[in-house]
Each structure stands twice: as structure tokens, then as C-alpha cells.
Amino acid sequence: MINLRKTHPLMKIINHSFIDLPAPSNISAWWNFGSLLGVCLVIQILTGLFLAMHYTSDTLTAFSSVAHICRDVNYGWLIRNLHANGASMFFMCLFLHVGRGIYYGSYLYKETWNIGVILLLTVMATAFVGYVLPWGQMSFWGATVITNLLSAIPYIGTTLAEWIWGGFAVDKATLTRFFAFHFILPFIIMALVMVHLLFLHETGSNNPSGINPDSDKIPFHPYYTIKDALGLMILLLVLLSLALFSPDSLGDPDNFSPANPLNTPPHIKPEWYFLFAYAILRSIPNKLGGVLALLASILILLIIPLLHTANQRSMMFRPVSQTLFWILTANLITLTWIGGQPVEQPFIIIGQLASILYFTLILVLMPLAGMFENYMLEPKR
């Protein structure tokens, strides 16, 4: 009998992507996050679909429709908690996935890396518009503050902000269009994921050593399907623990109050996964400058391949670059902490120093470290 998975036009694509795919024999658990992100996306789309069946995108009923989902819909509380905490798991996996790419030099597959950065931006946009939908206090004021940043763009800013709002402030039109965006974007993300995988399979996976693994490849199934299954179990354990035991621990208490344009919360802040960028935005006392720094903090990932100066691809055998990488990690954690603090001393100066260090590490210190390591590894007479 002819093996169907090797002959059927559709099964053949799946076979070459997930079953008979030649994979390096030495890839570590840091390579699990790609498949985990795929699982997160599927969980978010499925839970989101069921939430959309009961949600109403109207300023008068949005908040109560979310309450209705949690109180009256069968397992609605679970679906909502999985969706809200699934977003946190999604971003945790995303940050670890990007960090792995930087540490092991995966960014030198430029097409895959660039699509990945576009994916990151798209997921961030999706999460932002999704956070507005429950129409609580922090949803409303978060939407107001972030969309207001568009007005910092010279000449067209105010017109652009009002165009996004569909009026002169965040209101019914804004909520309706944000729901439309939040529904369509995950499907765009799915398409981009396919392009991401297409480019990845053109070159094959990188590996911890950073050297060409062509001489030693193994089939993806069963070796890495089993390895990914372990990661999946851990992901589901953490997600279910969060959703069942502590579903509101990552949310903001202000979002339990319905949106009120007449009452501003004392501290407006986004979800934890945006706090690092929010801290960079706040560290510059100029509106346009802050917006540019905010954009630069994410878009800087696009130029990382151009800043690679080392002769070795991976940081595995580069202790100076490793040290700088972990300083960058600690710096991002510091920025995340600062983003959640009120705008007062000493948090202002800590945020400004951490923001300067963030850009200095990526643009100056890491390329210099690569050049220094090249020099140290040159044979001396």
C-alpha cells in the first residue's frame, strides 16, 4: 500500500513540516517554544471564538456581557480565564522565544527573523485591542492613553487619532472596530505563522552550537514530538493552575469597575507584558520622543542581524556576550517593574537609566563585545 502521508498533496506538506522534517540532533528545550506558541495561538482562537458568541461590542452592554459570560454561560468563567491567562502564557513564550533567537544567533536567518518581528508586533496589537473589549476602567483609560499617542505625530496626528477613534474620543465606534480587529488579527497571525515556518524550513533549524548541523540530522517525529509534548504538559499545567486557582492575579483591579470617562484611575498601566515598553515610553518627558522610543524598543529587533560582529554565530562559547545578554534580561525585568510603578522618584530616574542601558546594550556594547571576542580568539604570534 502506498504511504498516504508521502503521496497525498496536502498530507505531504504536513509530513515535510512536522513528521519527516530533518532536525538537528542537539537542539535543547529552548527550541520548544515555537510549538508552544502554536498551541497558545490555537487555545486563544478557540476560547476567543466561544467568548465572541456571547460578547456584545457596545459601550452600554460590553461590561455586563462579560459578567454574563462568567456567571450564566456554561463554563464561561473557565473560557474567559483561559483566554485572559492564555495571553500571558503567549507573551511569556514569545519573550523566551525571542530571547533564544538572540542568544543562539537565530536572527541570522533574516527572513524568518523579520517575519517573527512582524508577528510579535501583530500579537502585541491584538492583545492591546483585546484588552479594551471588557470595557472596564483600565480598558477604557488604557485605550485612551495609548491611542492618544498617535496625536504626537506632526501635522496628521490629531486627524489620525480621531480616525482610529471614529469620533472625538474613545467611544462606541472605537469599541466596535476594536472588536472587529481583535477577531480578524488572529487569523492574520495564523497566515504569518505559516510564512514564518516556510522561511524556517528553507534553511532548517539553528542549534545551540551555531555550526552547520547538516551532517547530523534526525527526523522530527518521534524525537521532537515527544520533547514538545513535555513542554506542552508544563505549559498546560501552568495555564490551568493560573486559570483555576488565581485567575485575576495578572489583571488590574480597576478593570472590575465599568468604564467611566469622568473618573480617571490613579495609575494607568497596561498588562504586565507591555510594561517594559511603557516604562521606555514614560522615561522620555517629550510626547513625540516617547512614542519614537516606544517604537524603537520593539523595531530595534529588526536591525539586530546587522549588529552581529562576532565570527561565531551562537553565544554558547562567548562569555562576554553572554554576560551582556543576561544584563539585558535583568534590565528588561527592571523596566517591567518600573512600568508598573507611579511616576515619582526614585522610579523616574531608574526608568530613565534602564531605558538608556537597554539601547546602549543592543546598539553599542553587544557589537563591541563581538569584536573584542574576535580579537581575543585570533591566534597571537
Curated annotation (Swiss-Prot):
Keywords: Electron transport, Heme, Iron, Membrane, Metal-binding, Mitochondrion, Mitochondrion inner membrane, Respiratory chain, Transmembrane, Transmembrane helix, Transport, Ubiquinone. Binds 2 heme b groups non-covalently. It is found in: Mitochondrion inner membrane. Its cofactor is heme b. InterPro entries: Cyt_b/b6_C, Cyt_b/b6_C_sf, Cyt_b/b6_N, Cytb/b6-like_sf, Cytochrome_b, Cytochrome_b_C_euk/bac, Cytochrome_b_N_euk/bac, Di-haem_cyt_TM. The chain crosses the membrane at residues 33-53, 77-98, 113-133, 178-198, 226-246, 288-308, 320-340, 347-367. GO terms for cellular component: mitochondrial inner membrane; respiratory chain complex III. A ubiquinone binds at H201. The keyword Cell wall biogenesis/degradation does not apply. It is a multi-pass membrane protein. Heme 1 (or BL or b562) is low-potential and absorbs at about 562 nm, and heme 2 (or BH or b566) is high-potential and absorbs at about 566 nm. The cytochrome bc1 complex contains 11 subunits: 3 respiratory subunits (MT-CYB, CYC1 and UQCRFS1), 2 core proteins (UQCRC1 and UQCRC2) and 6 low-molecular weight proteins (UQCRH/QCR6, UQCRB/QCR7, UQCRQ/QCR8, UQCR10/QCR9, UQCR11/QCR10 and a cleavage product of UQCRFS1). This cytochrome bc1 complex then forms a dimer. Component of the ubiquinol-cytochrome c reductase complex (complex III or cytochrome b-c1 complex) that is part of the mitochondrial respiratory chain. The b-c1 complex mediates electron transfer from ubiquinol to cytochrome c. Contributes to the generation of a proton gradient across the mitochondrial membrane that is then used for ATP synthesis. Belongs to the cytochrome b family. This is Cytochrome b. It comes from Sminthopsis archeri. The gene is MT-CYB.
